């Protein structure tokens, strides 16, 4: 029997709700068709936003949405996406499929979407091909209430009051598609650009996000922090509130990533092993951040993460459309548990991407919509948002099919909500073994337990023909004991227990 020990009174750090954030880019069918269909569409919508998608996202309590990219952000010129739609400039989306971008979804539409979702706004600015003035004027357009050219332009375009802007990314992937810069050059550009990302609302400051590393580029993290902290007052912590990190799971590598649906046991464990590498990245980048920011004033912002496979056969290679199986449910559960356990440093994360792109929570086909296994994991994990991480540990054994791709059989995180409920999320990575869990809750009297689970065979997925193949089901097989609870977690599953 496996032992899980939980100490609900030993609180460690707050799990920011933003850890459960999402990412939307002008890429494939994410924005257009997936979220925005226009006011004249026969698909039910409110001001152009699909009502089915909006309601589904509200159900999982989406806390923050990042936009407009991604690589698209550093070729996006925001003034092309305001004003009457018929006069907006068209452009070629050179990064993603070479399609025409008509800019019918712009700043006003994004904030309309955030308002409908009830979520915070994370805008990524254009440092790669844009100017300091362009970035400064965008922030002014969005947030300034007084008399100014940009505030007047916003009012002319139909929005009298400014919006609230919660996060602003000063460039994206500037080590690559955002300008192919070296870390010292980018850091100096960051210093200059961020100066003009002004806080016009002292009671609602913009949190500035600096472009961090790609995967394990620890030199980038070190050099960027060194340059931004040089000749900078200590209390300004490099003039940043967050430093980003991007990491994707590519089962077979970057060039040939592997199928989203056709994989064997070896690739299953290989994928989960790569998902677990997120913890190493957080720890090693976090160690470098500790040198410059021991008080953890700078949040680690994992604003692109998830599984990236070879696109579905017959789809545009530039649209990055892929299916979603129980493997993705496990990748999501593993990764979110890691974020929870490192919530002292990880302050926001954004799954790539929200609809129809990469590890989506929603897929659409015309008027039809399906919820993916990943969606259902976010649904179960939403109770961790703004809860307190508490001390927990679980006994594990190593499993897998080859020595190189071994993984622990179980992974967990536990939080306590404001109402005192203990929320346990547990993943079983094994393809063939259930585990009986003896759970000890220290100094805690268990009165009630509710459970829910997502589980199935590793290839199971939801399709437009069978949309409910994978879904959240009740889990009632929990026994109360003198020391806590006892239950058996099935193979290939993600479990959430609420204990009171």
Feature map (PLM): residue ranges:
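Active-site His/acidic residue clusters
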Residues: 249-269, 315
């Amino acid at each position: 029997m496996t032992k899980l020990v939980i100490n609900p009174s030993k609180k460690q750090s707050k799990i920011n709700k933003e850890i459960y954030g999402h990412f939307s880019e002008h890429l494939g069918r994410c924005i257009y068709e997936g979220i925005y269909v226009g006011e004249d569409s026969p698909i039910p919508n409110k001001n152009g936003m699909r009502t089915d998608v909006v309601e589904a996202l509200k159900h999982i309590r989406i806390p923050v949405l990042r936009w407009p990219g991604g690589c698209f952000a550093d070729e996006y010129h925001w003034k092309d996406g305001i004003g009457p739609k018929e006069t907006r400039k068209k452009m070629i989306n050179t990064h993603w499929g070479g399609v025409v971008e008509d800019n019918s979804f712009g700043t006003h539409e994004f904030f309309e979407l955030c308002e409908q979702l009830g979520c915070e706004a994370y805008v990524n600015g254009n440092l790669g091909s844009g100017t300091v003035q362009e970035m400064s004027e965008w922030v002014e357009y969005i947030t300034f209430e007084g008399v100014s050219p940009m505030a007047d332009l916003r009012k002319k375009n139909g929005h009298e009051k400014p919006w609230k802007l919660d996060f602003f990314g000063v460039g994206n992937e500037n080590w690559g598609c955002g300008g192919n810069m070296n870390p010292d050059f980018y850091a100096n550009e960051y210093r200059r650009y961020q100066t003009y990302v002004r806080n016009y609302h002292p009671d609602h400051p913009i949190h500035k996000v600096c472009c961090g590393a790609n995967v394990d580029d620890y030199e980038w993290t070190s050099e960027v922090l060194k340059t931004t902290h040089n000749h900078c007052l200590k209390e300004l912590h490099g003039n940043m509130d967050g430093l980003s990190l991007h990491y994707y799971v590519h089962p077979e590598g970057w060039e040939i990533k592997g199928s989203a649906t056709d994989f064997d046991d070896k690739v299953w464990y290989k994928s989960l092993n790569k998902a677990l590498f997120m913890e190493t990245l957080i720890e090693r980048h976090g160690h470098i951040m500790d040198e410059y920011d021991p008080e953890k004033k700078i949040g680690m912002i994992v604003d692109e993460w998830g599984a990236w496979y070879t696109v579905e056969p017959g789809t545009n290679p530039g649209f990055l459309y892929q299916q979603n199986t129980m493997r993705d449910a496990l990748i999501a559960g593993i990764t979110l548990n890691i974020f929870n356990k490192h919530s002292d440093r990880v302050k926001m994360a954004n799954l790539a991407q929200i609809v129809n792109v990469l590890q989506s929570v929603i897929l659409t086909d015309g008027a039809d919509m399906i919820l993916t296994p990943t969606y259902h994991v976010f649904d179960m994990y939403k109770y961790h948002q703004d809860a307190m991480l508490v001390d927990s540990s679980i006994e594990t054994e190593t499993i897998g099919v080859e020595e190189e791709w071994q993984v622990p059989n179980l992974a967990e995180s536990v939080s306590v909500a404001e109402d005192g409920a203990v929320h346990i999320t547990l993943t079983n990575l094994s393809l063939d073994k259930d585990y009986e869990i003896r759970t000890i809750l220290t100094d805690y009297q268990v009165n009630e337990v509710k459970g829910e689970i997502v589980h199935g065979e590793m290839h199971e997925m939801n399709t437009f023909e069978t949309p409910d193949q994978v879904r959240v089901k009740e889990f009632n097989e929990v026994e109360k004991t003198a020391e806590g609870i006892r239950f058996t977690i099935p193979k290939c599953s993600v479990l959430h227990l609420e204990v009171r």
